[in-house]
Amino acid sequence: MVAVAAKKRLTPIPEHCFPVTFRFQWYERNRRRDKDNVSAFGRKVVLDGLVQAGIMPNDNWNYVEGFRDEFYVDRDCPRVRIEVYTYAE
């Protein structure tokens, strides 16, 4: 599902911009899940989807510099917002 959405909305990251850093903003319905459970599984799904969609060639150390996670509660609209910071920025 992530790969399908990524293909529709994103363009591939140019090779010269790697490695990239991801900023994840997690909006949960409530505070029931531990933050590490939200981010660890969520990051895996998102990054694998970006690779599968062809947005980035791989999610290994050569392509991913790191992560920044932020957590919020939004009872009406749980979601994740992702920003990608490239090496060139």
PLM feature spans:
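Catalytic phosphate/metal-binding cores of nucleic-acid and nucleotide-processing enzymes, i.e., regions
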Residues: M1-E89
